Amino acid sequence: MNEIMLSIRDLHAQIGARKILKGINLEVRAGEVHAIMGPNGSGKSTLSSVLAGREGYEVTAGSVEYLGRNLLEMEPEDRARAGVFLAFQYPVEIPGVGNMYFLRTALNAQRKARGEEELDAVDFLGLAREKMKLV
């Protein structure tokens, strides 16, 4: 059985007095891929924002655990280091910064936060090629 990576239980959240999430439940195990789908206004962006720790969203009930840790008690920076963050669907290209360099920097920030050794460019490229075979 695969480890539970993300567990959301009876999550309620609001912005101001407007209640948006009303009892969300979701469990994601290692190796699973889930798509959050729904019409405009159904709470997809709110759920993402709550998980990432964006300001302005108030969780009024429920719990969220990520890799056994209470995600709702973590600062947004700590969530990002753990791997929970929002990224642009169409990121702005930064001249001179390639995607592989950007991804290696992001991965190494996570590895450093976990006390693991950072990957050099050669090791990262090998890892990236290995993971691309899975897609």
Task: Label the predicted regions.
Residues 18-19, 78:
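Short coil-to-beta microelement around the adenine-binding A-loop and adjacent beta1/P-loop entry
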Residues 34-36, 48:
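Short hydrophobic beta-strand immediately N-terminal to the Walker A/P-loop
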Residues 37-42:
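The feature captures the beta-strand-to-loop junction immediately N-terminal to the Walker
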Residues 52:
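Helix-to-loop junction immediately C-terminal to a conserved catalytic motif
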